[in-house]
Amino acid sequence: MPGRQLDPRLVVRDLVQSVVPYDERESADQQWMLDWIDAGHPLFRTAKPATPDRHLAVYAALLDEAARTVLLVDHAKAKAWLMPGGHVDPDENPQVTVVRELNEELKIAPPFHARLGSDAFFLTVTETRPPHSHTDATLWFVFSASQQMEIVPDPAEFSACRWFALDDAGAWAGDSDPQMHRFMAKLTSALELAPVG
């Protein structure tokens, strides 16, 4: 039916359901997210800094596959090296959110990774740091990128941007998202298994 609007809750549920869990933790987080969605809880942040106290967020993994690196940003508020991303606006499709955030934060519009697709690749349920601790239910998307691409970081958001090697956990494992090591392991495994071309 032309012009028919999709239910935002069903769009989110489909994205969550489409993730193939990498480990027991991701499987448990996926079930938590599905139960949360199905229980009718609010999904979207409606007021800063953290209302409601559980809400959707997205990360954009910018992957230079040839160099085997990902871009992390030194997030000013979180005081940690994270993927670019942000909170999902009310009733917004998270796939739209992640593209919007890349444009707003870095002034780029890269394509979703050709082999990994435009669906969420990874998901996490994480308690954020004080002073405004809350629960982020985060969908992680993978984009094709290059270390040579021009990025214009928003200085209000980021202190720095840097490319990190996928297989150099010592470089990125310090002050970053607590689930970054699991994401990097899943991404490395998927790149080894994903068909080329």
Segments from the language model and where they lie:
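Short N-terminal secondary-structure initiator segments
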Residues: M1-S27, Q95-A114
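Nudix hydrolase/Nudix homology domain
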Residues: P2-R9, R13-Q17, A80, H134, ...
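Short low-complexity stretches enriched in small and charged residues
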Residues: D14-Q17, A60, N93-R100, L116-A120, ...
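Acidic, metal-coordinating catalytic segment for phosphate/diphosphate chemistry
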Residues: V20-Y59
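Short glycine-rich, low-complexity/disordered patches
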Residues: S27-Q31, F141, V196-G197
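N-terminal strand-loop-strand
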Residues: R45-M83
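Unchanged
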Residues: D89-P178
